[in-house]
Amino acid sequence: MVKCDYVYFIKGFFRMEHVNSTPPARPLLEMKGIAKRFGTFYALQDVDLSIYRGEIHALMGENGAGKSTLMKILAGAYTASAGEILIDGEPFPISSPKDAIKAGITLIYQEIHLSPNLTVAENIFLGCEIKTLFGLDRKTMAEESQKVLDRLGAQFLATQKVSSLTIAEQQQVEIARALYRKSRILVMDEPTAALSSRETERLFALVKKLRDEGMAIIYISHRMAEIYELADRVSVLRDGKYVGSLTRDNLDSATLVQMMVGRPLTDLFNKEKVPVGEEVLRVENLSDGHKLKDASLVVRAGEIVGLSGLVGAGRSELAHLLFGVKRATKGKIYLSGGEISFSSPREAIAHHVALLPENRKEEGLFLDLNILKNVTMATLERDATMLVIDQNKGKQTTQAAIEGLKMRVPSANVNVSGLSGGNQQKVLLSRWAAIEPKLFIMDEPTRGVDVGAKSEIYRMMIEMAKKGVAILMISSELPEIVGMSDRVYVMREGYTVGELEGDDINQERIMAFACGAQS
């Protein structure tokens, strides 16, 4: 069995470690009829949510469904346009973070919100410092902080600088701050996004411990395996509206997916048979002199060719050579029959070769620019006449991308940094689709996006294949490789070690090649 969240999700192999107890009769938290409007755009409409003491309540939905907006209202970062919040059955208006703290609510964002140059204790007491006549009582703050850290089982000291801690340890600091403030409701937004598997296990143990101590935990995640591991109840949002809730006893992956995206799980890939055209890419014995030892493959027009393998097999290195990020030390690359060797990505783009990088934030997006500028970044030269950029053409391209990929955004002028992971990936895909590629290399095209966004990306890939685009898809998700690929190459330790097609494309054969069990 491959240890992949999505594999577990498809096959339904989940662990159920605790027995769900009957919740108290009255919710600790109720959100009734919550709406949030940004101009004419409704991010939330008439949303209801109830949370009980001593439960882990998962909040799910596609990227852009309104999960983070709802939680920001709860934390006082946004003010609701309509609706009310009740704590212990009594109305409790929240219009600022200070109100949320008074209500006993703490939101731990996906991006850590700590001051790195301060100590752990100073961060825990930030805004509620202990003072004496002579200034801050750092000794008492450190002692009190250490008590909370010990309760959490932390392996670091309250006197350490936050900058010296790992992401997982910084999360513990945020949880410690919530405990010191006697928070009763803890909201965690995609807390495992930057954690290793071992750190994730420790976090799960801590979350369960807090639940057992009576804390109410709202857990936002798109990872199905985490939901089955932790959740007592699950509520789903779709398009800014409340769809429904499921208890642990009737939790079912197919039902959850249908609630999130409005269609059955079986429609996720919806792969169509596309006529295959002429050879677009041929790679012969390619090497970069380091991780990539000897890779050979072929991709034809209209094909989606999967490239699978374990981490470190050399797949991304191959992508970088094909796009001109690095130069090959050995081997040959042919594009539409002609031998090529790109010296830069700019040269690759000029030949209509696109690369969707593995890490969209560090290698692909300009986070401080808006959607329009990100989408048109690769076509500025093409759309310029006498050094004047055709703004209307760029706007039309961007608006078509927003509508075609169903991005839930107010406008093309929104900064990319504020978008969900799924919408960020759609922006990047739209940029490269705009160059009208003949070869599109996609490195982990659906990493970090929810099920709904995956479906939209798959649909886009199929439409591009119909237009004759040759797609080389690198993916670590075996269901994705199996569900989307016409043929599959498998890499191991820098070598292409197997090619599969037709009925031979299955998870077992792929892993046999990847692990060296088959040659």
Swiss-Prot record:
GO molecular function, one term: ATP hydrolysis activity
Record's keyword annotation contains ATP-binding: yes
A Pfam family the protein falls into: ABC_tran
Enzyme class: translocase
Location in or out of the cell: Cell inner membrane
Disulfide bonds: none
Gene3D superfamilies linked to this entry: P-loop containing nucleotide triphosphate hydrolases (3.40.50.300)
Gene Ontology CC: plasma membrane
Catalysed transformations (reactions): D-ribose(out) + ATP + H2O = D-ribose(in) + ADP + phosphate + H(+)
EC number(s) per entry: 7.5.2.7
Membrane topology: Peripheral membrane protein
UniProt entry keywords in alphabetical sequence: ATP-binding, Cell inner membrane, Cell membrane, Membrane, Nucleotide-binding, Repeat, Sugar transport, Translocase, Transport
Similarity-based family: Belongs to the ABC transporter superfamily. Ribose importer (TC 3.A.1.2.1) family.
Identification of the protein by name: Ribose import ATP-binding protein RbsA 2
Gene this protein is translated from: rbsA2
